[in-house]
Amino acid sequence: MAADKSASIPEVVTEAIVVIDIVESTTTSNLFGWYAVGRNIHRDLRSFVTDIGMGRGLRCVRSTGDGYLLTFFNPQSAETAAISATEAVFELLRRTEIRNREVADERSLNLRCAIHLGEVDVVLNDREGPHVSFAFRLESISRGSLPAALNPIAPEQLPLKNYVLCSEEVAGILERRSTLWSTRSIGLFRLKGFPGFREVFRVLSRQDPE
């Protein structure tokens, strides 16, 4: 009994957690059809996710219906995992931009992305724990969230699509360890299930800051 109980305890690791959401996925599928448009959008995203994860420590890929939960791991450094995750997300946005130039507007793939870092329980093809929930709360932040925030940016400064948000933990890592990206506070938010206000940042490429 003791051995069985021990075997059921999940491994705990520190990983970079990425949540990717397809903007207006359900609306697009309902309007233009899942088989005509929606399925191809999801297939393209899945292909991109597989490619960007190669060589960057991608360990978990789970569909959320309208996007993906991804985690990245580096055995030497959790901070390196956060940098790899950021690199992967911006490569994903780059490929998405190229793709969108070649398809009709209704087939465009537009994303919202969020990056966090923290301890997670490793379960088969999934991750569990409060840090996973936190990453989903980050991704859910939109222009509509700004009026309730402290010291928010102007709504027009937050794009409607194809942007990256991150937690304070990830912002600190990027500012210390990378010259490729900068971070900009968008305000302090109350995130459902988490106490107090949490500062949230937008991640920007230094090569293309806007």
Summary of predicted features, one role per range:
Residues 66, 114-120, 167-169:
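Short loop/turn motifs enriched for small/polar and acidic residues
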Residues 1-9, 14, 151-210:
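Intrinsically disordered, glycine/charged-rich C-terminal tails and inter-domain linkers
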Residues 71, 119-124, 147, 173:
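Short, solvent-exposed loop/turn segments at secondary-structure junctions
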Residues 39-58, 74-113, 117-119, 130-146:
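Alpha-helical scaffold within the catalytic cores of cyclic-nucleotide enzymes
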Residues 2-87:
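Catalytic NTP-binding/metal-coordinating core of nucleotidyl cyclase/transferase enzymes
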Residues 32-35, 127-131, 179-181:
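Short, glycine/charged-enriched secondary-structure capping and boundary segments
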Residues 10-12, 63, 108-110, 127-129, ...:
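A generic fold-level signal
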Residues 25-28, 120, 170-171:
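A generic structural signal for short hydrophobic patches within well-formed alpha-helices
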